[in-house]
Design a protein with these regions (language model features):
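C-terminal amphipathic helix plus adjacent low-complexity
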Residues: 502-561
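Short acidic-hydrophobic, aromatic-tinged amphipathic segments that line or gate anion-handling sites
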Residues: 241-250, 330-333, 425-432, 483-503
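Donor nucleotide-activated moiety binding/catalytic core segment of transferases
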Residues: 406-456
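A nucleotide-sugar donor-handling region in carbohydrate enzymes
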Residues: 154-177, 302-371
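Conserved catalytic-core segment of nucleotide-activated headgroup transferases in glycan assembly
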Residues: 201-217, 338-414, 520-529, 551, ...
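Active-site and donor-binding regions of nucleotide-sugar-utilizing enzymes
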Residues: 72, 194-337
Length: 561
């Protein structure tokens, strides 16, 4: 919503500014709107707005230039005309200039040689330079600066952009776009494996859930990103080397002799760009075990190995008509649940019960929409009626759908009202989103969730949980429901479900068997070692073209299927 409203609001303010300057004598108000619009764009979107506000910048510049022109005498001022032409040209070429300034790759926590000009001139500099030109014109109109000041400012920015063009042409013709610098830096670092990720900034949790366990492998590795927008947040959150490789050519430059294995945590479209390097071992981890289509996507056949939590993940492919070779699977458990505390007291014996409500997002397609937020109010009121405290932990991507975001806002309002009346310390919003899922799972006595990976994670605790069936086919399609209380999509049985969830809990014994089926039969002590050992084995294996004989899966400590 914020991404959509930003340019719309900026365009509206810019048009208003232009109308005022052309149709009224309120020049000060118009120029004030110019400055307010630029300041608002910077405040809301930082310095990463290159190309997003071309329309508003063009209108703002035109309005400021018109305000300046109205103060000029009737004769032609050639300095002003040239300056105006240059300024409007620079703004209209923001996207093209940004592409010239965009390096072939970016790195953080990895030593590379950077040319001095590229350290100074990048997409941020171009964006700020264009904003500065608009501010200069507005200031000149306010204090009646001579036109040669505008011309000098425009020429200065033009010289900077000309240097960018020359540097870009030289780099492309003589230095392979600078990709040789990346290869040399990686050869010096000698990574043994990569974590490859193609995703948007609001999905970085997919990386961070695996990062602690990859760090425990005690091997040199690099996080390879494909989406430019994700570079800054990921690079700021880890001390590990991070490389942005937006193109196929930059990926090719990242394949170095020390590299033996690549791990993946989603079904990103650009995974195929690096999977084609057959001398490497490619392992799909995914970002959770669930009944969503991502967990049985046929595209996973392109990977050499599929690390899965338990037998349920293997059977899921066959149950959904996906023919996946069994020798690709390796059962390694779900290391993220190693800190989940197993229940020791029946829920009926707990007086002040806390329930975690974890609705998922709407997904990108109809068949992946399992979101229960439309019936969330009914669920909350049944929990309130039984004196439960609620933790509402929504999916990080809930706000990507405006209707889901509105439902979530309504639920948060209901929680706030009940907290004010009852004194129960409900948790929602940023507070509930902080930390890891395991932290809230340990705090809760029961859970209500939609179809998502949080079910498998919570299953480890052996605590009672309910699952929403928004599409009406859950019981027959999903084995996890054997250990869950199922809420119908119309919420017609929610009262009965909550009674079982917080009362007798007749599915307690069944739930323990389902836990093994989904999360593997590994001892609680050292549970994550199954994954760590399997990952080390893959990393330590020689490259495929160096193999003298086929890899023996029987030597793996994790379960091979």
């Amino acid at each position: 919503m914020r991404r959509a409203l930003g340019p719309v609001t900026a365009n509206g303010l810019a048009v208003l500014s232009l109308v005022i300057v052309l149709g009224t004598s309120w020049r000060w108000l118009s120029l004030t709107l110019v400055l307010v619009t630029l300041a608002a764009n910077l405040a809301l979107h930082g310095t990463r707005g290159l190309g997003r506000f071309i329309v508003s910048h063009t209108i703002l510049a035109a309005g400021a230039l018109a305000a300046y022109a109205r103060r000029m005498p009737d004769e032609v001022d050639w300095a002003f005309c040239v300056a105006a032409a240059l300024i409007m040209s620079f703004i209209s070429m923001e996207n093209r200039l940004g592409r010239l300034a965009e390096p072939a790759f970016r790195t953080r926590h990895l030593r590379t040689r950077a040319r001095p000009l590229r350290r100074v001139l990048n997409d941020t500099t171009i964006y700020l330079a264009d904003c500065a030109l608009i501010v200069l014109v507005a200031a000149a109109a306010i204090v009646a600066l001579p036109s040669w000041v505008l011309l000098v400012g425009a020429l200065g920015v033009g010289i900077l952009y000309a240097g960018l063009l020359v540097d870009s042409l030289y780099t492309k013709r003589h230095r392979d776009g600078g990709r040789g610098d990346l290869t040399r830096a990686l050869e010096h670092y000698q990574p043994e494996f990569y974590l490859h990720w193609d995703g948007a900034p609001d999905a970085t949790y997919q990386i961070f859930m695996w990062l602690p366990y990859l760090e425990r492998l005690d091997r040199r590795f690099v996080i390879v990103l494909r989406d430019r927008r994700s570079f800054a947040p990921v690079a700021a959150a880890t001390g590990r080397p991070v490389v942005l490789c937006p193109t196929i050519a930059s990926i090719e430059a990242a394949i170095v002799p020390s590299l033996r294995c690549v791990f993946y945590v989603n079904n990103g479209v650009r995974n195929g760009h690096i999977v084609r390097f057959h001398e490497l071992t490619h392992v799909q981890l995914l970002h959770g075990d669930s009944e969503k289509t991502a967990s049985y996507n046929p595209v996973n056949a392109m990977f050499d190995e599929l690390f899965v939590a338990g037998r349920a993940a293997i059977d899921r492919y066959a149950r959904n008509g996906v023919d996946m070779p069994r020798d690709k699977f390796r059962i390694v458990g779900r290391p993220q649940v190693e800190s989940v505390e197993v229940a020791t007291t029946p829920i009926a014996g707990i007086s002040n019960r806390t329930v975690l409500y974890a609705p998922t997002w709407t997904g990108l397609f109809t068949d992946t929409n399992h979101c229960s937020l439309p019936i969330g109010a009914r669920i909350l009121r049944e929990l309130f009626a039984r004196g439960a405290t609620v933790i509402l932990r929504a999916h990080p991507m809930t706000s990507s759908n405006s209707r889901a975001a509105a439902h979530l806002a309504e639920l948060e309002r209901i929680l706030a009202e009940d907290r004010a009346v009852s004194g129960r310390r409900h948790v929602w919003g940023a507070a509930a989103s902080a930390g890891q899922f395991v932290d809230w799972a340990n705090r809760a006595d029961a859970m209500i969730a939609d179809i998502s990976s949080v079910i498998s994670d919570f299953l480890y605790s052996e605590k009672p949980f309910a699952v929403t069936d928004m599409n009406g086919d859950l019981v027959s399609a999903v084995p996890v429901t054997r250990g869950a209380y199922v809420i119908r999509g119309d919420a017609s049985n929610v009262a009965e479900v909550v009674d079982n969830l917080l009362g007798a809990d007749p599915l307690a014994d069944v739930r323990r068997a389902v836990k093994t089926y989904y999360l593997g039969d590994f001892a609680a002590e050292g549970y994550a070692e199954a994954f760590l050992t399997a990952a080390r084995q893959v990393i330590d294996a020689p490259r495929r073209h160096e193999l003298s004989k086929p890899h023996d899966p029987a030597s793996a400590p994790a379960v091979r299927c």
